[in-house]
Amino acid sequence: MASRMQQPLYILAEGTNRTHGRSAQDSNIRAGKAVAEAVRTTLGPRGMDKMLVDSSGEVVITNDGATILEKMDIEHPAAQMLVEVSQTQEEEVGDGTTTAAVLTGELLAHAEDLLDDDLHPTVIVEGYTEAARIAQDAIDDMVLDVTLDDDLLRKVAESSMTGKGTGDVTADVLAKHVVKAVQMVHEDDNGVFHRDDVRVLTRTGASSSATELVEGVVLDKEPVNENMPRSVSDATVAVLDMKLDVRKSEVDTEYNITSVDQLTAAIDAEDSELRGYAKALADAGVDVVFCTKSIDDRVAGFLADAGILAFKSVKKSDARALARATGAKRLGSLSDLDESDLGRVDAVSIRSFGDDDLAFVEGGAAARAVTLFLRGGTEHVVDELERAIEDAVDVVVAAIDKGGVVPGAGATEIAIADRIRSEAAGIEGRKQLAVEAYADAVEALPRTLAENTGMDPIDALVDLRARYETEGLAGIISSGRSGEIGDPVELGVIDPVAVKREAIESATEAATMIVRIDDVIAAK
C-alpha cells in the first residue's frame, strides 16, 4: 500500500514546463525589470534613442517607449505585460509610455525587496493599491488652476515633443501647428472630438522646416486620367461608396451574340451606362469625385471630357475625412443625386513630390478635418517626427478633454511621493512597508530624469525634496550642459493630468498582477 502511494502522479502533458513559488516570482519580476531597463534611458527631454533592427533588416530609430516595446521581440509572458501597459498608455492618452513602463519596473524591483523581507504578496498588493489611491488624490491637488488657452496648450505640446527627433524644426514651431490643428476641429455640433479629423501625412525630400498645416485633407492619390485638370477652385465635391463600372447581375448570365450588330448593340449599351455616370455627375455640377471603389477607364475618359477631376480606390478613412471636411454625403448610388448630397471646397490641387502626386483638398465648407503634412530628409526623420506629432496631438486633446494639466519635469511625482510617505505613517502593520516602497518607486522617475539630463541623481533628488518642502513646487529642468532644479510651471514644462493618472493606474495594475503570480505552467 505504501509503495503505491509513493508513485508519482502526472497531471500535465509531457514536456510541459512548470515554475512555481519564489522561482516563478523571481522570473517574472526579472523579466519585467529587464523591459523597464530597456527604455529607462529614453525618459525625458535628453533621453537617448534606440536603434531597432528587425529580421528583415528594417531599421527604426526612436526614443518613443511604445514603439520600442512594440518592435522588441518579447516572448516572456510577464515582460509582455509591460508591453501591454505601454500600449494601454498610448491608446488612452497618447504619451507617458516610457513613464508607465519605468514605474512598473520600479514597483516590481521594490516588490522583490519586500518579498526578500518575507512580506506576503497579498500584503504587497494591498499596500500598492492603497498607495495608488493616495497618488491619485495627490494628483488632484496638483492640477493647475489655469485657463487652457492656446499659449498653455502650446507648452503642453512642446513638453511632449522636447527631446524627440524633430529634425531641424524646433518643438515650439511644431507645437503651434498642433494646437491650431486641434482647435480647428476640436468640437463638432455634438461637442465630440473626432481624433481622425487631425490627420498626419509624411513625405521625404525636403527639410523638416517645410512641415505645414493644411486646412483640409491631403491624399496620397493621383487622378484616374492624365487629361483631367490638375487644379480646381471653388469646387463641388462628390464622395462615392460605389463602383463606376458596368453593373453585374446577382446571378451568372450568358449572352449568345450571333452577329456584329448584336455585339455593337451590347457595347453601345455598356457605353451608355458608363457615360450615364459621368453625365449624372456633370449635370449635378460636380467638379471633383472621390470614389472608394474602382472607376472604369471609359468612365474616367468621360469624366475627363466633362472637365471633372476624379480619384479611385480612396481609403474608407480618407472618405470619412473628406465627407467631414467638405460636408458631402457618402453616396452608394447616383440616382436622385441632389445638391444637398454634395460638398464644397475652396480648392483641389495636385502637387508633385519627386515621382509622387498628392491631392490637396483645402478649405472645406464643413472645416472638420486638417492635415499636418510633415517633411524630412530621410524616412527615419519623418517617421520619428510623425510619432512626435501624433503624441503631441493626443496630449493636447487629453489636456482639453480629460481634466486639465499638472506640473511636469518630475514635480508631480515628487509631490505624490511626499503625500504617500505622509499618509503611510498612519497605516498599521507590514502594509506600511509596501506603501512606502511605492513612494520610492514613484520617486525613481525624477531620479531617472535627473540622470538622463546629466545631473547627479542622488544630489538632484535631495535638492528636489528640499525645494518642494520650502517652495511647494520643483522639477528637473533641462538647461545648459546638464540640468537644474526649477519651477516647471514658470518655465512652461506642463503635462496633461490624464497622462499621470493613467501611468499610475496601469503600472499599479500590471505590477500587482505580476506579484500575485506564484505558478507558471508553460506548454511545450
UniProtKB/Swiss-Prot annotation:
<dbReference type="InterPro" id="IPR027410">
    <property type="entry name" value="TCP-1-like_intermed_sf"/>
</dbReference>
<comment type="subunit">
    <text>The thermosome or CCT complex is a oligomeric complex of two octameric double-ring structures; the complex is probably a heterooligomer of CCT1, CCT2 and CCT3 with yet unknown stoichiometry.</text>
</comment>
<dbReference type="InterPro" id="IPR017998">
    <property type="entry name" value="Chaperone_TCP-1"/>
</dbReference>
<keyword id="KW-0547">Nucleotide-binding</keyword>
<keyword id="KW-0067">ATP-binding</keyword>
<dbReference type="GO" id="GO:0051082">
    <property type="term" value="F:unfolded protein binding"/>
</dbReference>
<dbReference type="Pfam" id="PF00118">
    <property type="entry name" value="Cpn60_TCP1"/>
</dbReference>
<keyword id="KW-0143">Chaperone</keyword>
<dbReference type="InterPro" id="IPR027409">
    <property type="entry name" value="GroEL-like_apical_dom_sf"/>
</dbReference>
<comment type="similarity">
    <text>Belongs to the TCP-1 chaperonin family.</text>
</comment>
<dbReference type="InterPro" id="IPR027413">
    <property type="entry name" value="GROEL-like_equatorial_sf"/>
</dbReference>
<dbReference type="InterPro" id="IPR002194">
    <property type="entry name" value="Chaperonin_TCP-1_CS"/>
</dbReference>
<dbReference type="GO" id="GO:0016887">
    <property type="term" value="F:ATP hydrolysis activity"/>
</dbReference>
<comment type="function">
    <text>Molecular chaperone that assists in the folding or refolding of nascent or denatured proteins along with ATP hydrolysis. ATPase activity is highest in thermosome assemblies containing CCT1:CCT2, followed by assemblies containing CCT1:CCT2:CCT3. Not required for thermosome ATPase activity. Not required for growth.</text>
</comment>
<dbReference type="GO" id="GO:0005524">
    <property type="term" value="F:ATP binding"/>
</dbReference>
<dbReference type="InterPro" id="IPR012714">
    <property type="entry name" value="Thermosome_arc"/>
</dbReference>
<dbReference type="InterPro" id="IPR054827">
    <property type="entry name" value="thermosome_alpha"/>
</dbReference>
<dbReference type="GO" id="GO:0140662">
    <property type="term" value="F:ATP-dependent protein folding chaperone"/>
</dbReference>
<protein>
    <recommendedName>
        <fullName>Thermosome subunit 3</fullName>
    </recommendedName>
</protein>
<dbReference type="InterPro" id="IPR053374">
    <property type="entry name" value="TCP-1_chaperonin"/>
</dbReference>
<dbReference type="InterPro" id="IPR002423">
    <property type="entry name" value="Cpn60/GroEL/TCP-1"/>
</dbReference>
<keyword id="KW-0346">Stress response</keyword>
